[in-house]
């Protein structure tokens, strides 16, 4: 790290500092101050501080000779020769040296950066992530990295972090996790040897863009070792253990400031600054929507809580990708070896879509219900719910998935061609807009009255689904991570009012954690104001929930009058019987 940057950070240039080295006649006020200081018995006139450039600190009684006044301008002028194009700290001390954000008020990992770039660098280093340039791929002509851009090249952003002086050895080493099978880009199971290869390749990736080789030893996992429970990373349907979002309390460190939540009168809580290793919140107590109080004070490292949140995001991503893989196998002619190529964000491509046939459409069938059952069984703390609560969450998951998955698939492969893509890969052309079936004389277009009745029951719902859900949702331009978190959040939210008291406590805890994860995902992406983006996603829940309710009412009518021959499980789900 540049010593000039540290010098600028700890000793910013001020007029008072510069005047002490200039030949300016002292003012009467300064003489009075000097006299008062000289008359004080505690003031040592023989004190001459010295500056140790090796450690960038002032020390009394140092063996180094005191600095001379004519050497100071040379030190300051060296700021213009920053390594690898690093921005000069004297140009704009509050500007991020990575994305030029004006919110870089302090140093992060040795370089001046905003919180978003610091979070990006921390996660990249702690997870040993390597990136490929989305632009030309030429490091001499990097992509533009600016905080106002929605999509920033991660490869070029990481290089700029290194150029800004951010050092990987200052990032806390990632704790040892429970060994589980993780799907890689080729569908392989991670082994110990592969982990070593990944670590060595990551070292080569970082050292390619750094001038100094990493010589600091890696931190060994010790008493603050974090373990992820098996029920969280690889949930078992037979398991009844809830998701443990807490971490093992480590010993206190007096030198690390953080925020501690302590109980207060009533249900309110207040924050006080303490010297500990605690995070700004406890996930188990983060919700204020259910009764309870903190019985004891716990101290958790902030980085462990953040890792928990990112692992929760990865868990929901894997769960949704697994559901997409099942649909890809069920509804397309794809080959099995193509399923494991990468994370499946959308199971359908344009050439795999089929025209919608209202005559044979019957909604979810048995294999669809099995897919949703596997999907919802992976939800954290789902196994801790009561049987009736599981029934409610599963039913709501079927309804939400049917509508929201259709909106997301339409956004990915259908909106540009003005198509509504259904959950099973069927599409409906919306240009020209199809008739609803209620127009005068529309019955003459159908062979039988039964076909006309089925069409005018289904098509108005599909038209409303396209114009009131698919189009507004496409305008959000959600990422895959935002989509999977929003979907899980809506399932928990819409199920809340039918759950028992214990189920509502679990639901509130999961909702709060998902909202925190949404904010972290948006913040890491580099949005200028993550709160606004999260607010837009939360506001979309209103029209999504409205469409889910409209679909449920429509299917109730269709099953009651036998307009559509639905699966027997559909009749059972729409009955809402608890026993």
Swiss-Prot record:
Its main location: nucleus. InterPro entries: HNF4-like_DBD, NHR-like_dom_sf, Nucl_hrmn_rcpt_lig-bd, Nuclear_hrmn_rcpt, Znf_hrmn_rcpt, Znf_NHR/GATA. Residues 93-173 bind DNA. It comes from Caenorhabditis elegans. Residues 233-242 have a biased composition (Low complexity). PANTHER family: NR LBD DOMAIN-CONTAINING PROTEIN-RELATED (PTHR46397:SF3), NUCLEAR HORMONE RECEPTOR FAMILY-RELATED (PTHR46397). The keyword Hydrolase does not apply. One of its GO terms (molecular function) is zinc ion binding. Residues 233-256 are annotated as: Disordered. SMART domains: HOLI (SM00430), ZnF_C4 (SM00399). Residues 304-577 form the NR LBD domain. The lineage of its organism: Eukaryota, Metazoa, Ecdysozoa, Nematoda, Chromadorea. It holds the Pfam family zf-C4. Orphan nuclear receptor. The keyword Protein biosynthesis does not apply. A zinc finger (NR C4-type) spans 96-117, 133-161. One of its GO terms (cellular component) is cytosol. This is Nuclear hormone receptor family member nhr-22. It is found in: Nucleus. Gene3D superfamilies: Erythroid Transcription Factor GATA-1, subunit A, Retinoid X Receptor. Belongs to the nuclear hormone receptor family. Keywords: DNA-binding, Metal-binding, Nucleus, Receptor, Transcription, Transcription regulation, Zinc, Zinc-finger.
